[in-house]
Amino acid sequence: MPRICIVPRTEGVGGMASFRLKLEAGLARRGMEVTHDLAEKSDALLVIGGTREVRGLWRAKRRGTRIVHRLDGINWAHRARRTSPRLWLRSESANLLLAFIRRRLADRVVYQSNFVRDWWMRRYGPVRAPGTVIYNGVDLGIYTPSGDEIPPADSVRVMVVEGSLADGQEAGLPWAVGFAEALAQRMASPLELLIAARVTAGQQAHWGKFSSVPVTFLGVTPREEIPALDRSAHIYFSAEVNPPCPNSVIEALACGLPVAGFAMGALPELVTPEAGCIVPYGGDPWKLDRPDLSSLASAATAVLAELPRYRAGARARAESAFGVEHMLEEYLQVLLD
């Protein structure tokens, strides 16, 4: 019975924790063991992002254990805007740790998207470890259009789901509000914006006062509640800047929720024309320029005019590329073959 070591043992509601839980559940269904102890003997070792247990990785490598490094994006927003010295140092240190594991310890590298792979190649150059792209996956039986929840008939509901829109990740929050405001001007029905993410109290108060559309802040939402939220909305707005491979977008697609966003990060890879609308950014996202919200709102209006077709397209896209079983098979090939 193969044993896979997975480090670090991330917890919470973020993408890394969600991925770990899905992977471990899939391995268990196949009768495989999972450990988080680097000292235990294992057939393969998966590093999700970074870990400070570098000595343990060295020991595992000397034992002949295959090390697979799963990479997300590179910390960059701290360079694009004024931030605290503590956040700047933390971001740079994390980048150096990831680059070290990728170059010195990994036997295989998994990039979450073509965008992520190309980004790492540009910033830190090629490495000896073979690399492959594996998109994130979701349980298509849980994230599904089937359910009791339906969008309101007398209003338009825009959905945003992120782990955090704070601590250096808040740039997408005014974009979400601006998109909702621009879309509301094109709608005959009232519009509301729902944001399921960590948002500071100050930001909540600000947008509650100055937004021209109603904004409901739901806070960090348990992952088991996300499918119902997605099913209850008309359209999803992708608020992350240069998203590497956003789980929330894939979850929305699986629930039949069309996605609206800008052509940055991995979004053009994930959201095909039949699954939503992706438009040119209209500036430089790496400099956090203000995007072309008007063009996106116009494109979203066309999606809402043919919502049943786009709902079906979103679900079809998820079924074709983002099933968790397909993701698991690809990881097993990298880990064990």
What are these regions (language model features)?
Residues 204-227:
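Nucleotide-activated donor-binding/catalytic signature segment of Leloir-type glycosyltransferases, i.e.
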Residues 228-233:
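Short alpha-helical donor nucleotide-sugar binding micro-motif in glycosyltransferases
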Residues 149-181, 194:
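Conserved donor-binding/catalytic core segment of Leloir-type glycosyltransferases
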